[in-house]
């Protein structure tokens, strides 16, 4: 009787844990990365507000299989900031 309750509890707990997981592609270091990964994205345009920073982070999450996000980063080559997708 006690073991059947334990099994039922274990299955319920496992189901709850797995229901919140999100599938993302895994990229191994030796594999080829998408061009958006680890680079500046000048085609993003102006990147100078919090909304732009959030939009940049989402674009990098959606477009780069490393799933590290991104943000508006100042660069020396141009005034202002540019969207940059993170590597690590």
Swiss-Prot record:
Disulfide bonds join 37-87, 47-72, 56-83, 60-85. Its main location: secreted. Keywords: Antimicrobial, Disulfide bond, Fungicide, Plant defense, Secreted, Signal. Pfam families: Defensin_like. Residues 1-23 form the signal peptide. Transmembrane segments: none annotated. GO terms for cellular component: extracellular region. It is found in: Secreted. GO terms for biological process: defense response to fungus; killing of cells of another organism. InterPro entries: Defensin-like_20-28. It comes from the Eukaryota. Belongs to the DEFL family. This is Defensin-like protein 24.
């Amino acid at each position: 009787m006690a073991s059947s309750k334990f099994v039922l509890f274990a299955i319920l707990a496992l189901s709850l844990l797995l229901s919140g997981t999100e599938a993302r592609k895994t990229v191994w270091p030796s594999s080829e990365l998408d061009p958006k990964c680890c680079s500046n994205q000048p085609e993003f345009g102006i990147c100078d507000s919090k909304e732009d920073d959030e939009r940049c982070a989402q674009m990098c999450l959606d477009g780069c299989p490393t799933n590290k996000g991104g943000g508006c980063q100042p660069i020396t080559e141009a005034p202002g900031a540019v969207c940059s997708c993170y590597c690590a």
